[in-house]
Amino acid sequence: MGRKQQYGTLASIAAKLGISRTTVSNAYNRPEQLSAELRQRILDTAEDMGYLGPDPVARSLRTRRAGAIGVLLTEDLTYAFEDMASVDFLAGVAQAAGDTQLTLIPASPASSVDHVSAQQLVNNAAVDGVVIYSVAKGDPHIDAIRARGLPAVIADQPAREEGMPFIAPNNRKAIAPAAQALIDAGHRKIGILSIRLDRANNDGEVTRERLENAQYQVQRDRVRGAMEVFIEAGIDPGTVPIMECWINNRQHNFEVAKELLETHPDLTAVLCTVDALAFGVLEYLKSVGKSAPADLSLTGFDGTHMALARDLTTVIQPNKLKGFKAGETLLKMIDKEYVEPEVELETSFHPGSTVAPI
């Protein structure tokens, strides 16, 4: 039987080169403290001796840090990489993280998730802190993060959790220009499409009670902001149909658009709380030989690259900046630096070309 292969260690590399273990360690962890020549000599010797570098598990036990931050989102990973607003947000977090590893923590949004399973998910995440991205009020994962004592920053929702900095635009105010564009174009028969309002599943019509008690306040505030503009224009809020898409993906967005427009064929305009829903409307219109704005005026919210390329009438929010601010704030918290308790992001209105006079 052959002898088991022996790999180099910090001590054996140090002994061979006649230097200290600390100097060898610095070649990996603090290279700026060594000359380029010495560092290269250490790395070459380590390679010859089969040393693979510092053990991250041993390092985390020694420093009590994982060297990673997490992003908790109540969506599956497919959504995280297909929804353009989320892609931009995660790119911003990654930019802020720099050399710090980024871990995605996908959690179920369902109301059936209990505190035990939420705590288990959070406890299994090897992270030093968490960015909470667009999670419902009362979600058990938030309590689990608090119970573990992890620093946390909230982006979008839920608002104003004690000890957790909050970063978001004023959604109620931000959507007003999109709603006003429809009013100014003469539209009075307007429908609203929203993504998930509550942890309890619902696809289809939204009751006033569900809207008022919504656990996802971003969508609630956008709907409310639009309704305020409509009411100011003399529209009876009871005549404005609101439909919800609980799973935000292409198929479901198409289906909810189809349901809204087939059950309310008199609508001349649709306001969407996210660009993705507006694309569902565009896809449905195309399937029946229609288009926007020729047959229906349409607005979105997010200002994703795809929306701007289509020249959708929409509200632009700085999703990448939001992610960067969230990541930057979390890293400061981990290092016990001062952070602002709340950051309100600016939005802008893109008039686009999907709203036309009635």
UniProtKB/Swiss-Prot annotation:
Recorded GO MF terms: DNA-binding transcription factor activity; transcription cis-regulatory region binding
Record Gene3D superfamilies: 3.40.50.2300, lambda repressor-like DNA-binding domains (1.10.260.40)
Alphabetical list of CDD domains matching this protein: HTH_LacI, PBP1_LacI-like
Source organism superkingdom: Bacteria
Claim: Transcription is one of the keywords in the record: yes
UniProt note on regulation of activity: Myo-inositol causes the dissociation of the IpsA-DNA complex in vitro.
All copies of domain HTH lacI-type, residue ranges: 8-63
Any one GO biological process: cell wall organization
Knockout mutant characteristics: Deletion mutant shows growth defect and altered morphology. Mycothiol biosynthesis and phosphatidylinositol-based glycolipid synthesis are abolished.
Residue ranges: DNA binding: 10-29
Keyword field: Activator, Cell wall biogenesis/degradation, DNA-binding, Repressor, Transcription, Transcription regulation
InterPro entries per the UniProt record, alphabetical: HTH_LacI, Lambda_DNA-bd_dom_sf, Peripla_BP/Lac1_sug-bd_dom, Peripla_BP_I
Assembly mode: Homodimer.
Cited function: Plays a role in the regulation of cell wall biogenesis. Inositol-dependent transcriptional activator of ino1, which encodes inositol phosphate synthase. Also regulates other target genes, which are most likely involved in the synthesis of inositol-derived cell wall components and mycothiol. Acts by binding to a conserved palindromic motif within the promoter regions.
Annotated protein name in UniProt: HTH-type transcriptional regulator IpsA
Organism: Corynebacterium glutamicum (strain ATCC 13032 / DSM 20300 / JCM 1318 / BCRC 11384 / CCUG 27702 / LMG 3730 / NBRC 12168 / NCIMB 10025 / NRRL B-2784 / 534)
